[in-house]
Structure formats: structure tokens, C-alpha cells
Amino acid sequence: MSVYEKVFDKIKENNIDVYPPNVHKGKVNSNYIVLLDGGRTRASTFTSQTVLLDVLVYVPAHRFTDLDLLSSKVKNIVDGLYPLIIPTGNETAAFYDESIEGWMKSVEYRYTVQGNE
């Protein structure tokens, strides 16, 4: 099982709606998470790579105060997978998207893979 799948399953086990990218469509009618591959980097000539994983937190327009609550809840859940996955400390500011009538912020995590995993 991949790290992505472990994080996805851990969030889902805690009764939070979670989706892979480009699956949830339309307006934000309830709180949910999108789990997104944030890319990879390789240091120098080493074969290991650092993989970034973005947790995108969405809440409806009228539930702005839920944004930080849901974000904190998800961070506590994902932090339970440490040291498999580690927070980078990067979080975006809240952003309102009129096209989906919802608020979003993201929390970034990282993990390391060997070779071309």
C-alpha cells in the first residue's frame, strides 16, 4: 500500500469525506478533503526522492469558521502516521473560490521514497 493510500484511508477511517484530485465536482455543500500529489524532488545524486503530499481542505461558503477546525482535525489524524509522513510546516492562507462557493486552504506533508518508487 502506498503512502498516499495510507493517508487517504486514515482520513476516511475518521469519517471525513476525502477524494482524489478531480473527483469531487460542483459546489462545496459540505466539508471535505482532496488529497493531491504535490510533486517530487531529488537531492544531488542520491537515488531517494522527497515526495510532497498536499491536503486540500474545503468548507462551504457559510462555514468559514469550520476551515481551521477541519484543518486541525486532519493534521492530528495525519500526524498519527509520523514518521512515515512528516509535515513541512507549509500551509496556505484561506482562499474563497466563487465558482464552487467554498473556502479552501492546503497543508503540505512530505515523505521519502528510495529509487523510482
Could you tell me what each predicted segment is?
Residues 1-22, 36-117:
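Charged, amphipathic alpha-helical segments and their flanking helix caps
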